[in-house]
Each structure stands twice: as C-alpha cells, then as structure tokens.
Amino acid sequence: MTELRQRVAREPEAPPEDKESESEAKADGETASDSESRVEAVTQPPSADDTPEVLNRALSNLSSRWKNWWVRGILTLAMIAFFFIIIYLGPMVLMMIVMCVQIKCFHEIITIGYNVYHSYDLPWFRTLSWYFLLCVNYFFYGETVTDYFFTLVQREEPLRILSKYHRFISFTLYLTGFCMFVLSLVKKHYRLQFYMFGWTHVTLLIVVTQSHLVIHNLFEGMIWFIVPISCVICNDIMAYMFGFFFGRTPLIKLSPKKTWEGFIGGFFATVVFGLLLSYVMSGYRCFVCPVEYNNDTNSFTVDCEPSGLFRLQEYNIPGVIQSIIGWKTVRMYPFQIHSIALSTFASLIGPFGGFFASGFKRAFKIKDFANTIPGHGGIMDRFDCQYLMATFVNVYIASFIRGPNPSKLVQQFLTLRPDQQLHIFNTLKSHLTDKGMLTAATEDK
C-alpha cells in the first residue's frame, strides 16, 4: 500500500479537461492572430510590370502618369471591342461569358485566401472551395434551366428526373461537402478552418448569386443586360477622365485617387449616355424582346411584339425647361425614363462596390485581385461594381417592370394531373363568363 502511494505521488498530475481545452483555444487564438502578419509576408505582390512589351517600348518616353493613361485607354478600347463581339454572337455566348467571368472572379478571391494561409497546410481547402462552387452553380442554374427550357426538360427523361428532384439533389451535394469539411477539421487549426469556410461562402454569395441574377436580367431582354453594364463602364471611364484632368478634391480614403470632380462628372456623363444608348437600342426587337427558347428550331429567339416600354410616346416638358429650349413636348421611349434610374444607380451607388473591393484589397495589402489585364488588374477589379448593379437591376425589374408571365403559368398548368387541369379550366370558364368575356354561344361551341 505504501509502495502504491509513493508511485502515485511520483506520477505527474493529469491536466484537467478544462485546462486542455483552454490551452487548445489559446494555441488556436495565437494562430489566428498571426494571420495579419502573414498577410504582409505572403500577399505583398512583387513590383513587376505586367504591361505588354510592345506598349512598354512605344510609351517609354512618357511619364508614369501618362503611360498609365495610355495603357488603360488602349486596353479599355480592346475590352469594349470584345464586348461588342460577344453581343453580336448572341445570348448563348453571353451566358457562357458570364459563367467564365464568375469562375475567374471566384478563383481570384479564393486564391488570395489560399496565399495568406497556405503555409498552415489546411486540408482540402481549395478542393472544398471548388466543390461548393459546383454545388451552388448546380442549384441556381438548374432552377434557371427548368424555368426557361421547360418543354425541353419535360421532353427528355433524364432532364425531367433531374428537374423533379433538383432541390433534393442540390441539398445532398451540399450536405456531402459539409460533411467533408467537418471530417477535414484539424485540432490545431479549428478556428482558421472555420474562417476559410466562411470566406468561401461569402465569396459564393457575392460572385455566384450576382452572376445568376445577370443571367435572369439577360432573359428579360438583352437591353436589360447591355444598358446597365454599359452604364457602369461609361461611369468608370468618365469618372477616370474627369478625375485625371480636373481632379483636385479627394472623395474617399479607401481610394485616394478617386475625386469629387470625377465622381460628379461621371454621374452627368453616364445619365446622358444612358438616355442615348436606350433610345438607340429601344428601336430594335433583338434587344428589347425577352430571350426565349424555341422548341421547333432548338435555338434562342428574340422576336416579339415590343411592349409599351419600347414604343415612342409624347411627353409634356415642364414649363421651366420649355422657356429654355423652346419645346413643349418630346417624343421618347418609356424605357429611357427607366434608364435614368439605372444610370443614376450606376453613378452614385455602383462605385461603392469598387470602394468595398478597395477596402478588401487594403485589408490584405494587395494592389489588385490579379494581374490578368495590364493596367486594370484582375477580372474582379473590373466587375466589382457590375455585381452590385446586377442585383439592383434584378430587384428593379421585379418591383417596377415584370408582371405575371402567361407562358410560365401555362408551363405549370401542363405539369398538373388531368383532373386538376379540368378543374382549373372549368373555374376559368366560369370566371370569364361572369365577366362577360365568354358568351353562352361561345361556351356551347
């Protein structure tokens, strides 16, 4: 007995469970607190010039200010030309480009997180990030395919099954990724892994959701896609030009190069541009008609009878303005009035998407999201305002433009059982008869 007591006294006292968890939390906390210093050490980009050699030689005699002006200008014209080309190629190509832009933006944001924390060797971080991107895209675009390609989906048996159980399949895919994340948790990196889990989901919310709304805007008519994007591009260009030549007063600390002169000049230029572009595009059916799938030709069609938004109307000019310009009325498309709201948002609120991105880049001490486009940075640097604009346009259409869609009602009607269809038919017939829109003679026939 004495020997046993001596042995117990010699053995070190086992640490209580609370102390163990406390030490774990402390170690984990130290790991998280080190992340800020890691940002400086890891993500500081090398000061390399990504300008093409041809432009470097041609602009070698210019100052850095004017060299940047010409580089940005030339690349901007190239991007505008590319934008015209993809518009000419039609809605299907536009949707593919939107998907490519979405994937590239996601890659740029996730890469920043990976560069900061890759030294910790977090298991499955990149794999799970891309897996969740696949899951979310399957969920969103599966719904879109069902909505806009209903007859095609119902015609093909595999697509019909996928459509019927779409949400369950989407949930199962996400749940699989969730379980994989839980299984990947490592004792010394708990907090950091949850940081990156949140990082991935916020990125998905910003990038995938917004690009999904862009696709929906496109299906409402190409004009709802082209005008908002063009307004953001115009505001970006004109704000830069006004700021370059007249900028004196700083606008916001997050972006020291942004000035009030550029902000105000960009606003007025964008409103005028939006009115002119809307006037030109409203006269073409290929721009104003909703994008629909034709089952007979298995292709997209943009042919319809334009709605009242795209028919010229005469408006009375306020008396104050009449005395200045001498006109009493003006003929314009109702859509031009809506374009003022779009261009105003693109000029006054849209830049805050850029300020948000600037704050993000400052937090990680990087200049650009990537160096994909010389003089401009990454793809995300060009689309930081576009995503905010896409959300506004979608909400604007749903609130002020879109009404009941007869074609979708017919699609839903055709999915019902025959007895349900007959019940709706009799109810509708009685309703139309009571309204006097369906006479007894017509009913007998």
From Swiss-Prot:
One of its GO terms (cellular component) is endoplasmic reticulum. Pathway: Phospholipid metabolism; CDP-diacylglycerol biosynthesis; CDP-diacylglycerol from sn-glycerol 3-phosphate: step 3/3. It is found in: Endoplasmic reticulum membrane. Its EC number is 2.7.7.41. It is a multi-pass membrane protein. Homodimer. The modification Phosphothreonine is found at residues 31, 51. Residues 1-52 are annotated as: Disordered. Catalyzes the conversion of phosphatidic acid (PA) to CDP-diacylglycerol (CDP-DAG), an essential intermediate in the synthesis of phosphatidylglycerol, cardiolipin and phosphatidylinositol. Exhibits specificity for the nature of the acyl chains at the sn-1 and sn-2 positions in the substrate, PA and the preferred acyl chain composition is 1-stearoyl-2-arachidonoyl-sn-phosphatidic acid. Plays an important role in regulating the growth and maturation of lipid droplets which are storage organelles at the center of lipid and energy homeostasis. This is Phosphatidate cytidylyltransferase 2. The keyword Transferase applies. The chain crosses the membrane at residues 79-99, 132-152, 166-186, 213-233, 262-282, 340-360. The keyword Nucleus does not apply. GO terms for biological process: CDP-diacylglycerol biosynthetic process; lipid droplet formation. Keywords: Endoplasmic reticulum, Lipid biosynthesis, Lipid metabolism, Membrane, Nucleotidyltransferase, Phospholipid biosynthesis, Phospholipid metabolism, Phosphoprotein, Transferase, Transmembrane, Transmembrane helix. Its main location: endoplasmic reticulum.
